[in-house]
Design a protein with these regions (language model features):
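Exposed beta-strand-loop-beta-strand "reactive/processing" segments of non-cytosolic proteins
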Residues: 23-56
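A short, surface-exposed beta-strand/turn
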Residues: 50-73
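Surface-exposed beta-loop interaction hotspot
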Residues: 65-125
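A short amphipathic beta-strand at an alpha->beta junction
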Residues: 151-175
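Extracytoplasmic/periplasmic, Sec-exported soluble proteins
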Residues: 4, 8, 68, 72, ...
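Short, non-transmembrane alpha-helical segments in secretory-pathway proteins
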Residues: 1-27, 76-86, 144
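Extended amphipathic alpha-helical interaction segments
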Residues: 100-148, 152, 156-160
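Extracytoplasmic/luminal low-complexity segments enriched in Pro/Gly and acidic/polar residues
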Residues: 170-229
Length: 229
């Protein structure tokens, strides 16, 4: 990197450390040319599994980041993974918060429900890779009930997208962990056997187990952002 770029990159870790009181490591730098910003994938020492985006203005060296929303999403993902595990469903999820307000909260120990309420999280998008090649009615029912319960606990609507993977499961999970945004193509190039979608709106699931199984499709790809329309 040239000197100015290096200074910009250094500004990210310095600024984040001052803001959150942790040390941070840049994993990847992007958008070097043609924009006023430099974007980086960053992890913290305290939560190395949470990869998030930070942007620095080349001129002013001002840094913005989405560390806290990724951290809160990670905690929701952990809870979902644990809850599904109780039904012997092995999974890993990527959680995206759709926030109305973006308060500059720096408390990394903040309660999940409180964070969602304060930031006006109406909806949460969940992408889940499931380590299985088929799903029966009981499993589909357990899955829907688990997501429904989580929606009630956090008082928020969910848009849920599931992928059945077998051979590529571990490498897909590693890609999901290393990529901050769900808009990144971490799902590309994997052998997805089936995909399915459902929503939780105001405490009601849009599909029951049978409907979910009937709607499973091996070809229903499409852009990840457009699949719930």
């Amino acid at each position: 990197y040239n000197n100015n770029t290096q200074k910009s990159i250094d500004a990210i870790t310095t600024e984040l450390s001052e803001k959150y009181g942790d040390s941070f490591e840049i994993q990847k730098v992007r958008n070097i040319t043609g924009t006023e910003y430099i974007q980086a994938y960053v992890t913290s020492e305290k939560y190395p599994d949470v990869t998030f985006d930070a942007w620095v203005d080349r001129m002013t060296k001002e840094v913005t980041d989405d560390y806290l929303s990724m951290l809160i999403g990670f905690r929701i993902q952990q809870k979902l993974t644990e809850d599904l595990n109780e039904f012997d469903i092995k999974s890993y999820s990527k959680v995206t918060l759709l926030l109305k307000n973006k308060h500059d909260i720096t408390d990394t120990d903040m309660d999940v429900k409180l964070y969602l309420a304060e930031n006006g999280a109406d909806e949460i998008i969940i992408h889940t890779s499931l380590m299985m090649n088929t799903m029966d009615t009981n499993m589909a029912d357990d899955l829907i009930k688990t997501v429904l319960k989580l929606s009630e606990d956090y008082n928020v609507n969910f848009l849920f997208s599931g992928y059945l993977l077998v051979d590529d499961y571990e490498s897909c999970v590693n890609d999901m962990k290393a990529t901050p945004s769900v808009n990144e193509p971490w799902y590309g190039g994997y052998d997805v056997l089936k995909r399915f979608y459902f929503s939780i709106k105001n405490g009601v699931a849009t599909k029951n187990a049978t409907e979910l199984l009937n709607s499973m499709d091996s070809e229903s790809g499409g852009e990840l952002n457009g699949i719930f329309r």
